[in-house]
């Protein structure tokens, strides 16, 4: 295929697509240039159907540091495991693509996005999402696209598509919306307490922009697209399916309607085990035994899926007996753990999350060194999902993509209400431990996080609560569900998570299994979520009505002082010698930023006070008219040098030592003496003159002696430097002889 170039303008930037030049052995590949960001996307498909009961789709987003003209960090100086941002971007691309493959498609598909050049004002993630859809669409891989995505901002009351970095910093909204030309199928957002109306407007305007990108893709597919390959889809034997449904559907229906999760799982598993045993015996010697048993398992899964959906859409009954807009029983607890800086335990039905707060000096912030300029991350929210939370055994190790994604969602939801660094100069870490799970564990972690922050004395602007909404859609009819449990998530069509305060939304996340949802469904889901959010906030506020006024006794206390920027090097000292000495002497932790803000941390207030005193002394400046208790450190003929404080000395001239005349400095002071002095002058070079006599009472002028007679002592005329007293002669001058 010869190289072809397609070009348009989108959101004020050039969008160029090149095909037929690179990565030609992949099923489909494109180079997308958006502004000065360049992304290569290659899509490949395995030749055979994979084993397993899921579609093996892998989407990667690979950040090459050379794209931003940077060296990778670390000893190896080579890219290693994906960054958190890269992992989140890969998930962002995976989620709108996954629903666009046919039911039963089991061939492995990999979509690899490589960032080759990076322009911080032209979104590389959105270029990668565009490239992923286009590479699949022009390939022979059976993909029912195209899809596209855009970023949406909200600045000065205006919706902005693909905002620049400067606009993004000012924006009250950080939204990514993706979909087909007919409907939205993925949402990811953080927001500064925006209303449902503004969020809906942003979603719909974002979708209008998505349609533009899809039209451009369709033009390219028409020009260079390949014919789609014929692949085998997983299907079950129709006669076997009819036989099992007729014999066991009523048993499975009863099992599905058991309200308690573990009892329901046991009941449904008992039916499945019974059916499996029957057919294992029946087809034990059949040459296609493995295929038949795979079909039996798939048929039973389909039967359970169909019954759950029928109950909700036709009978308006949920598996646990709730109404469609009813929340499971709620419980909130603070101070679940001693010694920690704050803790909250939140339970919703059989979903339970424990959140633990840790406060630390700003030196503990996370340094993020990716394609963007390096920055420090002050707030971290980590989410852990152990297998025991669902009563199973399984893998333990580093967090997977799901845990990273759920942690990031909670982080966005809670970050919007955190105090500023000036108000609360701490690094903040929340860890959510999911102790039980039956759906919506990420939203439980947000609620538990609010409890931990409030109990720990972090002055958040308002409590945040989260709720997960579901959808069962059957043709033209649909049912929106409040607070979905695991079964409804598994067999439903949508998982729409909404978090926020009473004043507005702080985070959204939507994943769907169908190809899109309408504005009508979005509106209804947002309205139901708001009602549910307020119910949860009632429970949180009843448990802890307001943020505690003080930090936990075990949390590090903090004091701050401001120093001149040019004094920072004095506090740090050569090679950190001075600051290390202060830390060793007092046991505190000290952080100094580039603006001269010094933060001192310790659990011991006396230690903080001592460190603060030392630092204040190091950067202290003498001021005219201030009085100091000084120590004589050097004596010269013309005066004495005294140490005012630390490394600041002043000269007390001999004439400023006393009101009476003296010829020798040593007659008044010796080295080591402590004297009170007053600063009388600081010249342009910073040299300080001080006076002792300025603090002494001025003696009266000696105009008369004790008898009241006028003194005969000659007066020294003022302002005559060379004046000498007249000499009194006692002998007759020689000239008179």
Swiss-Prot record:
GO cellular component entries: cytosol
Keyword Plastid carried by entry: no
Entry-linked Gene3D superfamilies: GHMP Kinase, N-terminal domain, K Homology domain, type 1, Nucleic acid-binding proteins
Entry's EC annotation: 2.7.7.8
Locations listed in the record: Cytoplasm
GO molecular function annotations of the record: 3'-5'-RNA exonuclease activity; magnesium ion binding; polyribonucleotide nucleotidyltransferase activity; RNA binding
Protein name: Polyribonucleotide nucleotidyltransferase
Species the sequence originates in: Streptococcus pneumoniae (strain ATCC BAA-255 / R6)
